UniProtKB/Swiss-Prot annotation:
Catalytic activity of the protein: uridine(2552) in 23S rRNA + S-adenosyl-L-methionine = 2'-O-methyluridine(2552) in 23S rRNA + S-adenosyl-L-homocysteine + H(+)
Active site positions: K164 (proton acceptor)
Gene designation per UniProt: rlmE
Annotated disulfide bonds: none
Protein name as it appears in the record: Ribosomal RNA large subunit methyltransferase E
UniProt-annotated location(s): Cytoplasm
Lineage: Bacteria, Pseudomonadati, Pseudomonadota, Gammaproteobacteria, Alteromonadales
Biological role stated in the UniProt entry: Specifically methylates the uridine in position 2552 of 23S rRNA at the 2'-O position of the ribose in the fully assembled 50S ribosomal subunit.
Documented EC number(s): 2.1.1.166
Keyword rRNA processing included in the entry's annotation: yes
Family as reported in the entry's similarity comment: Belongs to the class I-like SAM-binding methyltransferase superfamily. RNA methyltransferase RlmE family.
GO molecular function annotation: rRNA (uridine-2'-O-)-methyltransferase activity
Length: 209
């Protein structure tokens, strides 16, 4: 991509961002990102998080999903968040900064979870996009596979999983793997997800493995 095209694309994104209804609404409500509305919409439809639940939030920074999750889980609940990027503290959220792909970070995350199983695993993880589909899609699929592996390690029976997946190579195989692990799997495209984005959210309930 030429510098000129990249600049035009970046300018378009910035214009969309500042004109975006959800960006303005997130600022008005004190939410850290427009992504918070995605998990809110999923919660409204699927009721994943209830008071007292333990939630793991992968790819948490800047904290939009964690803000919603900790509010829903309440004082008796627990939210454990992880991201390679730093995140300002959120009351009630136990945040671990590190690369989830690294064994030592995974071990540290599992230590924070402890012996008790968790009720919900959330993943809004995405790789740094290069703009090359043949590079970006495998990276994105690797992250969602790691998120599903996390479910296998920590999720309680009948637990739930919400994960961002980019449609493309590997999507159908991944959907099959999620369906094998959960009783019900739904595909959601929240209103707050940009229409031209290939992202969808798989919402899986009734963990059975």
């Amino acid at each position: 991509m030429s510098g000129k095209k990249r600049t035009a694309s970046s300018s378009r994104w910035m214009q969309e961002h500042f004109d975006d209804h959800y960006v303005k609404l997130s600022q008005k409500r004190g939410l850290r990102s427009r992504a918070a509305f995605k998990i809110e919409e999923i919660q409204e439809k699927d009721k994943l998080i209830r008071p007292g639940m333990t939630v793991v939030d992968l790819g948490a920074a800047p904290g939009g999903w964690s803000q919603i999750a900790v509010k829903l889980a309440g004082d008796k609940g627990k939210v454990i968040a992880c991201d390679i990027l730093p995140m300002d503290p959120i009351v009630g959220v136990d945040f671990l900064q590190g690369d989830f792909r690294e064994e030592k970070v995974l071990d540290a995350l599992l230590t924070r979870v402890g012996d008790a199983k968790v009720d919900v695993v959330l993943s809004d993880m995405a790789p740094n996009m290069s703009g090359t589909g043949g590079v970006d899609q495998p990276r994105a699929m690797y992250l969602v596979e790691l998120a599903l592996d996390m479910c296998h390690q920590v999720l309680a029976p009948n637990g739930s999983f919400a994960v961002k997946v980019f449609q493309g190579e590997g999507f159908d195989e991944y959907m099959k793997a999620v369906k094998e692990a959960f009783k019900t799997v739904k595909t959601r495209k929240p209103d707050s997800s940009r229409p031209r984005s290939r992202e969808v959210y798989l919402v899986a309930t009734g963990y059975k493995l």
